[in-house]
Every structure is written in C-alpha cells, then in structure tokens.
Amino acid sequence: MTVVIGVLALQGAFIEHVRHVEKCIVENRDFYEKKLSVMTVKDKNQLAQCDALIIPGGESTAMSLIAERTGFYDDLYAFVHNPSKVTWGTCAGMIYISQQLSNEEKLVKTLNLLKVKVKRNAFGRQAQSSTRICDFSNFIPHCNDFPATFIRAPVIEEVLDPEHVQVLYKLDGKDNGGQELIVAAKQKNNILATSFHPELAENDIRFHDWFIREFVLKNYSK
C-alpha cells in the first residue's frame, strides 16, 4: 500500500514542495516503513487519492478565491478536518488553515482548522524578506542550523486552544505590536503550520523528512 502525499497546486510554490518530497523518497526510501508517492492536487478527485496534504506558500487570498470559485473549498475543508488525514500549511498555507486572522480577515475564507490567530504579512513587504538560520533541534534531531526563509510571512499571534496546539518555535524578539513571533506550531499529531518556506532550503530536506516521519507515517500507522 502506497502512502500518498498531495501538494495543493492551485497557486504558489507547490513545485518546490513536490521536489523536496521526491528527494526525501529517493534518498530515504530504505528507511521509511511504507512506500510513498507525491502528487499535485488541483481537484477533488486528486485530493481523494491523498493521505496527507501540503498547502504551500503563495497568496492566501488567491488560493481562497480559486478554491471557492471552482467549488473545491468544501472538499478541502472536509479533508483537512478528517482526523485520519495529515495537513501542513506553509506561509500562505498557514494563513489558509488558521481559525482566525487578526488583519485583512475579509480577504480570506480560511479552512478554520488550526486553533490560532494569525497576523498576515507580519514581516513587512517582500523587500524585507530574509533567510534566518534557526535551531530546530528541540523537535528535529540534529537540526540546529536550518535556513528558514520568510517571505511576507505571517506569525501566530495567539494560540486559541493551548491544550491541543503546541508551539514548536519562536523567533527572538517581538513584532511592532509587542507580540511574540511564533513561526511553527502543531495541532495534535496531524496538523503542522510553518510561517517560513522549508521548500526553499536548497538541497536541505530535513524539515520535509521530519514531516514525513513524524506526521505522515505515524498518523498512517495508527
């Protein structure tokens, strides 16, 4: 039985995610306990084949509008709310899966999944984007130097359900409003959110490999 990881391909940086997952499969196939495959997802028929879904960075407003206008929103909503499925939202994807937005909330109809409040464009305009070396070794073994790229990135301003949502990583400092810069979190063991772009870490698949091992394979084996 093959475990299928889908990458939502309505808009955004989906090809980079596909390539990183493909690289994980090629380099680590002997260490994964299940056979894996990856595919792009543009409609409900493709989504129905998936065990996990990565929602990429891009433009959350465009993503939301495309899903609604094509009649895909309800299928996405049902998928991500299914506890047997795994969901990972990166940057715009994190915005799209969150329950609340603190700004520009009328522009995005979210999937109302991750129990947090998110601030869009917390790092300013694209010219202010940057790559920061982050120590993720508290949750990814030996990953103390990951190049995390933030592009007009959101942050989690508030965790609405601390019982089920675990903060994985905060950047040093605070935003202009005095809020902590929470940039990675998980909900239970099947929902992951990152405000940065692990798929833009060239030739570095550590984050995707961890996602596959800790979310996809563990959830599938239940």
UniProtKB/Swiss-Prot annotation:
- Kindly state which reaction or reactions the protein catalyses: aldehydo-D-ribose 5-phosphate + D-glyceraldehyde 3-phosphate + L-glutamine = pyridoxal 5'-phosphate + L-glutamate + phosphate + 3 H2O + H(+); L-glutamine + H2O = L-glutamate + NH4(+)
Name the residues that bind L-glutamine: 58-60, 120, 151-152
Q: Where is the active site?
A: 91 (nucleophile), 197 (charge relay system), 199 (charge relay system)
Which pathway does it take part in?
A: Cofactor biosynthesis; pyridoxal 5'-phosphate biosynthesis
Q: Would I find Hydrolase among this entry's keywords?
A: yes
Enzyme Commission number(s):
4.3.3.6, 3.5.1.2
Known function = Catalyzes the hydrolysis of glutamine to glutamate and ammonia as part of the biosynthesis of pyridoxal 5'-phosphate. The resulting ammonia molecule is channeled to the active site of a SNZ isoform.
The entry's protein name is Probable pyridoxal 5'-phosphate synthase subunit SNO2
List the CDD domains hit by this protein, alphabetically.
GATase1_PB (cd01749)
What is one GO biological process annotated to this record? Answer: pyridoxine metabolic process
Note the InterPro entries from the entry. Answer: Class_I_gatase-like, PdxT/SNO, PdxT/SNO_CS
What family name appears in the similarity comment?
Belongs to the glutaminase PdxT/SNO family.
What does the UniProt keyword field contain?
A: Glutamine amidotransferase, Hydrolase, Lyase, Pyridoxal phosphate
Q: Does the keyword Hydrolase apply?
A: yes
Provide an example Pfam family for this protein.
SNO
The protein's GO terms of the molecular function aspect are: glutaminase activity; pyridoxal 5'-phosphate synthase (glutamine hydrolysing) activity
